[in-house]
Regions:
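Membrane-interfacial helix termini and adjacent extracytoplasmic/periplasmic loops
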Residues: 118-236, 302-315
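Start (N-cap) of specific transmembrane helices in multi-pass transporter permeases
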Residues: 61, 65-73, 90, 110-111, ...
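Non-cytoplasmic
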Residues: 115, 128, 240-247, 284-309
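Short membrane-interfacial helix/loop motifs at transmembrane-helix boundaries
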Residues: 5, 18-62, 69-71, 124-129, ...
């Protein structure tokens, strides 16, 4: 009797969630699937017309560009955010004083509204934005910067070779030697600037339009637009902190004995990362990549906020294509929007299936 009552109570608590899923997922998916085979346009009752909406969608140049943009965006962004999230989690996994503060600080971009972040990036990459300003300053101060870096590298090399000649341990990035090299480079650069040998150059303001119709091409084929590249940078910036938490949780489950054994064998930090950390985090990496692919293939809000600030072809994604076909003036081709949404769902499903089939660790299947 107690077990039966307990089961009923559990289902009562689950009922609101199950009802919401049934209405907003299964029912909505069923309606979208039905409309994708009709001529529905919001003004006339739907009539079945077979696969014509799918043929129209696949033949639409904007859909083809949206599909290409979505695939490139998903592959590039997922790769970048996975790599940076892993490296950041390894860096923040050290037991140092104040590490909790840095973990919280690095997580801030993920709790900030994506709309706000998009507006900030629009400001950063406008024609008179911070990006162009920094490039202008780099061009103006390039002689001083290159001189400083060259003197620093030379001084560091001389010090390291001198210490090793005296049979003393010295690394190329030894902090004490690096401080001396930086001081020498700073003094010499100042002296050369003071005597007029080198100095700040007069350069025109760097004027690059990041949200124009500009593309990175491969063999004459448009691969990645510059506006979409800006969105990739922004999306990576906002999603890395969240994915970092998954890697941090996975790092806690790696036995310390493995790292101790690697230290005994004389493994370098890079070897420990590639031979110990990465293999042990493979199930977590599968989850991170899966979440990343699903999220990036459905990316919509950043493109919607940018809107007309960039040409439509440079930023349109599958999710934005569905939106623009659903909410437009006149008889909106909702059937084409539904067909595109079904195709997007099938692509995501295929990606996850292939990844689970070929790239997941055996432990994740158990």
């Amino acid at each position: 009797m107690f077990k039966k009552g307990f089961t009923v109570t559990a289902y009562l608590f689950l009922a609101p969630f199950l009802i919401a899923v049934a209405i907003f997922f299964f029912y909505a998916f069923g309606r979208a699937l039905y409309y994708s085979f009709t001529n529905f346009d919001l003004f006339h009752p739907p009539q079945l017309i077979g696969l014509k909406p799918y043929r129209d969608v696949l033949a639409d140049p904007f859909f083809q560009r949206a599909l290409a943009n979505s695939l490139v965006f998903a592959l590039v962004t997922t790769t970048l955010q996975t790599i940076f999230a892993l490296l950041m989690s390894v860096a923040l996994n050290n037991r140092l004083r104040g590490m909790a503060f840095f973990r919280s600080a690095w997580y801030m971009p993920s709790i900030t509204s994506s709309v706000v972040i998009t507006l900030i990036f629009l400001w950063l990459f406008q024609r008179r934005g911070v990006a162009n300003y920094l490039i202008t300053q780099w061009q103006a101060y390039q002689p001083l910067i290159l001189t400083f870096l060259g003197v620093f590298a030379a001084a560091q090399m001389v010090q390291v070779l001198w210490e090793r000649a005296r049979r003393l341990p010295a690394g190329w990035l030894d902090p004490a030697l690096a401080a001396i090299s930086a001081l020498v480079a700073l003094l010499l650069t100042w002296a050369l600037n003071f005597t007029g040998v080198i100095g700040v150059r007069e350069v025109p303001p760097f004027d690059y339009q990041y949200f124009a119709d500009k593309w990175i091409t491969l063999g004459g084929v448009k691969v990645l637009s510059i506006p979409l590249l800006v969105v990739i940078i922004q999306n990576t910036f906002t999603t890395v902190p969240t994915l970092m938490l998954f890697f941090l949780a996975g790092l806690q489950n790696i036995p310390r004995a493995l790292y101790e054994a690697a230290d005994i064998d004389g493994a370098t930090p890079l070897q420990k990362l590639l031979r110990v950390t990465v293999p042990m985090l493979r199930p977590v990496t599968f989850y991170v990549v899966t979440v990343g692919l699903i999220g990036t293939m459905q990316m919509f809000d950043q493109v919607a906020v940018i809107g007309s600030a960039a040409p439509r072809e440079t930023l349109i994604t599958l999710a934005y294509y569905v939106y623009t076909n659903t909410f437009q003036a006149g008889a909106a081709p909702v059937n084409m929007a539904c067909a595109a949404a079904i195709i997007l769902a099938l692509i995501i499903l295929a990606m996850v299936f292939l990844q689970r089939r070929f790239f997941v660790a055996p432990e994740a299947n158990s």
